[in-house]
Regions:
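A short glycine-rich, Lys/Arg-flanked "PGG" loop and its adjoining helix->strand segment in the class I
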Residues: 194-210
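Class I SAM-dependent transferase core
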Residues: 4, 19-115, 145-162, 269-270
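Conserved SAM/SAH cofactor-binding pocket of Class I
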Residues: 92-191, 197-198
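Short alpha-helix immediately C-terminal to the canonical SAM-binding loop
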Residues: 146-148, 218, 222
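SAM/dcSAM-binding transferase cores
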Residues: 6, 223-278
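Short strand-turn motif at the edge of the Rossmann-like AdoMet-binding core
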Residues: 142, 190, 213-217, 241
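Cysteine-centered motifs
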Residues: 1, 6-8
């Protein structure tokens, strides 16, 4: 595994995130999200960075999430400002390392297709879909109730670049419609890497990327997943620190490059990857 702890320096990452959020040469707009006074400066910056329409879409997402969360388990975070810092900002923070990894290899990021595996409450997929309207997103979620929420969120946010697929990752990975069809697979807080790799890599085309949002110290997970990742046709590309307002003050993005076709026997039957990891 190549563990270069990141494709760019900490200062460069902050600059990339700033440009992502604020836009180069574009004047920041007044936020539509009425964040509480306890919200951090970073969360406020993230809110002001988006266009008026994008701010509105994020606001509608947060409103829908907190409303539906009263009736079903979508998130343990129930405060609006915490949703901004721990979900919205964290989701946006994976974009700079992802785009850097893509463009540094000569890739065109104008029309990326991304599958959010185990999307849950739509994180990071729905937030990334707001930030990158030219990309095509598929939210893959196995629980019907959560899919109903995702479909509602897509509708109220007026997102035309998002599809919701209610299926298990193991089934989708063996489906002709989805197998090795995405430029990028992304996952956040779904499972440990050696399990997650079997969910995600069969969905990624050869030459595409798998990015996993992880905690502040994923090194043991990375070591444990090395053999599984190799069997699935990929190798580690980078490990990046990303800006985070989480409890540890830092998260990481682990990036893998899909180098070879995944053997047909993977992913295995639903439930097997988690019960018997590679």
């Amino acid at each position: 595994c190549r563990m270069s702890l990141c494709c760019c320096s900490a200062g460069s990452r902050r600059l990339l995130l700033s440009r992502l959020l604020l836009g180069q040469g574009r004047q920041a707009r007044r936020p539509l999200l009425h964040l509480r006074t306890t919200a951090t400066a970073a969360a406020s910056s993230s809110a002001t960075s988006l266009s008026t329409q994008q701010q509105r879409q994020v606001s509608l997402y947060v409103e829908a999430l907190l409303d539906w969360n009263q009736r079903m388990n979508l998130t343990a975070v129930t405060d609006e400002s915490e949703v901004m810092t721990r979900h919205v900002v964290d989701s946006l923070a994976v974009l700079p390392p992802l785009e850097h990894a893509y463009t540094s290899r000569g890739g065109d990021i104008s029309g990326i297709s991304l599958v959010d595996v185990g999307s849950g409450a739509g994180l990071p997929g729905l937030i990334l879909a707001v930030a990158r309207p030219s990309w095509k997103f598929t939210l893959l979620e196995s629980m019907r109730k959560r899919c109903t929420f995702l479909e509602h969120a897509v509708e109220v946010m007026e997102l035309s670049n998002v599809d919701v697929v209610c299926d298990r990752a193991e089934s989708a990975g063996q489906s002709h419609d989805f197998r090795e069809s995405f430029d990028v697979a992304a996952a956040r807080a779904v499972a440990e890497l050696k399990i997650l790799a079997e969910y995600c890599l069969p969905l990624v085309r050869v030459g595409g990327l798998f990015i996993a949002a992880k905690g502040h110290d994923p090194h043991e997970e990375i070591r444990s997943a090395k053999a599984a990742v190799g069997k699935l046709g990929a190798s580690m590309l980078d490990l990046c620190n990303v800006e985070s307002m989480g409890p540890h003050g830092q998260r990481t993005a682990v990036l893998y490059l899909k180098e070879r076709t995944t053997p047909k026997k993977y992913p295995r039957q639903p439930g097997t990857p988690s019960k018997t990891p590679l």
